[in-house]
Amino acid sequence: MTLPPKLFDHSILKIRRNRTDENSWFMHDKAIEEINDRLSEINRDFEKIAIIGFRAKSWAKKLNLNATYINDGDLINFDGKSYDLIIHAMGLHWANDPVGQLIQMKRALIPDGLVISVFFGGQTLSELRISFAYAEAKILNGISPRIAPMGEIRDLGGLLQRAGLALPVADNIKFDVSYETPLQLMHDLRGMAETNIIIDRSRKTMTKKFFDEISKQYFHHFSDNNGRINSTFELIFLTGRSEEHTSELQSRPHLV
């Protein structure tokens, strides 16, 4: 089987995740709240649960679930076990082979098992991405991949079908977060371990001149009436089943 080319450097991701800051995990909390709401709408008790992600233990505690914790590398180690609920927690946007991960999850489901994956979508950090582009064009006369590409919801729903999951549903929620400066935003991104891990990323250190230009462009294009900047965070939710079944499952609008 031919594997897709690797886009992300997971060795760097692991290092950065070891340096995360709890005070910057607010988007995980937003995702947990939404997952909790969705699970509460399902008339079913899940007994065999797996949570995939580097913060799986924290997720299980906040969701009040007795779950197995699994790392989210390209190969997911289910250790031969099967589950009726698998939650992929804020990591699929860093997958080199997201379809492959969904297929692995499908294979680890018992009949009528449920997969829920939540991760950052393509509108995340759109303002910072544009500000980087303006600054690079002005200072460096070119544009490099400073922020990792993230999928658009119109495309991501198809991943569920490609993985062979039944009853595929894709939807999103956007959050606007206010900051005093771009530096505060970047501090949060480091605290989340959501900085650039593209293998072909620029290794050059940002100069003060370059960073000042990024800030200038950000404030010029995306500041509000209070002199603060806005940053978009988009959460994508993918939901699928191991097979068609008549058990009750409340779901968001079908978008795939």
Model-derived features: positions:
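Conserved Class I S-adenosyl-L-methionine
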Residues: 24, 171-243, 247
